[in-house]
């Protein structure tokens, strides 16, 4: 994978110039960007950002932009639980794609504040993974996978207001949606072309 240098932003202050990496500068405006697969390291950074922004201002919304193919279920659940835990409402915005755990986090945003741009792609499916080891270990892992699957379906049904039976059926295979279809499904609240359209939504 080619190395992509980190962009930096230089601002003028009364003390002179100050340089920020692009993610730190976005954080100043209460913007968090998830633009990678979800793993433990990514989850820890996003959780830290959520907690920091809560400590900065517990009453002001946080904007989580998502362009992610998904990833680890446990890492995604850690981010999701923190989104529900912090006092500020977390608005979610899909750019590009929100697949698997990316779609789960998109749906987990504050009610009325979940958005996607017109050409975004959203995909839900059941968790996947292979099991190795002795027969007893495989049985334990399979039971845990079924427990997690049921938990994810339950949460998704609650956020989309879809019957859990439909969530179970739709996630048996990769289920792709356009932004408009995701709105009809209840996974997002609106599709917008310009940022100002989202800002007009009631806070």
Curated annotation (Swiss-Prot):
CDD domains reported in the protein's UniProt record = S14_ClpP_2
Task of the protein: Cleaves peptides in various proteins in a process that requires ATP hydrolysis. Has a chymotrypsin-like activity. Plays a major role in the degradation of misfolded proteins.
Transmembrane regions listed in the UniProt entry: none
Q: Give the HAMAP family listed for this entry.
A: ClpP
Query: What gene codes for this chain?
Result: clpP
- The entry's keywords: Cytoplasm, Hydrolase, Protease, Serine protease
Q: Where is the active site?
A: 100, 125
Q: What class of enzyme is it?
A: hydrolase
The protein's name is ATP-dependent Clp protease proteolytic subunit
| Entry's Gene Ontology molecular function annotations | ATP-dependent peptidase activity; ATPase binding; serine-type endopeptidase activity
By sequence similarity, the record places it as follows: Belongs to the peptidase S14 family.
How does the record describe its quaternary structure?
Fourteen ClpP subunits assemble into 2 heptameric rings which stack back to back to give a disk-like structure with a central cavity, resembling the structure of eukaryotic proteasomes.
Q: Name one Pfam family in it.
A: CLP_protease
The record's catalysed reaction(s) read:
Hydrolysis of proteins to small peptides in the presence of ATP and magnesium. alpha-casein is the usual test substrate. In the absence of ATP, only oligopeptides shorter than five residues are hydrolyzed (such as succinyl-Leu-Tyr-|-NHMec, and Leu-Tyr-Leu-|-Tyr-Trp, in which cleavage of the -Tyr-|-Leu- and -Tyr-|-Trp bonds also occurs)
InterPro entries, per this entry? ClpP (IPR001907), ClpP/crotonase-like_dom_sf (IPR029045), ClpP/TepA (IPR023562), ClpP_Ser_AS (IPR018215)
Organism of origin is Anaeromyxobacter sp. (strain K)
Localization (cell): Cytoplasm
The organism's superkingdom is given as Bacteria
Gene Ontology biological process terms in this record = protein quality control for misfolded or incompletely synthesized proteins
Q: Which GO terms describe its cellular component?
A: cytoplasm; endopeptidase Clp complex
Among NCBIfam families, the record links this protein to: clpP, PRK00277.1, PRK12553.1
- Coiled coil (residue ranges): none
Q: What Enzyme Commission number(s) apply to this enzyme?
A: 3.4.21.92
């Amino acid at each position: 994978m080619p190395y992509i240098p980190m962009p930096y932003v230089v601002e003028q202050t009364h003390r002179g110039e100050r340089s920020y990496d692009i993610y730190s500068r976005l954080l100043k405006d209460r913007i968090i960007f998830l633009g990678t697969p979800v793993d433990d390291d990514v989850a820890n950074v996003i959780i830290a950002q959520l907690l920091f922004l809560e400590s900065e201002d517990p009453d002001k919304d946080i904007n989580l932009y998502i362009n992610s193919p998904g990833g680890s279920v446990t890492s995604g659940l850690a981010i999701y639980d923190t989104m529900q835990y912090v006092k500020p409402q977390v608005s979610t915005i899909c750019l590009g794609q929100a697949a698997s755990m990316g779609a789960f986090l998109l749906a987990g945003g504050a009610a009325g504040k979940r958005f996607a741009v017109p050409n975004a792609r959203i995909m839900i499916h059941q968790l996947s993974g292979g099991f190795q080891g002795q027969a007893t270990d495989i049985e334990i892992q399979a039971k845990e996978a079924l427990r997690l699957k049921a938990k994810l379906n339950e949460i998704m049904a609650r956020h989309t207001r879809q019957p859990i039976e439909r969530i179970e059926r739709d996630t048996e295979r990769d289920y792709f949606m356009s932004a408009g279809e995701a709105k009809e499904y209840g996974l997002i609240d609106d599709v917008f072309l310009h940022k100002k359209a989202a800002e007009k939504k009631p806070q």
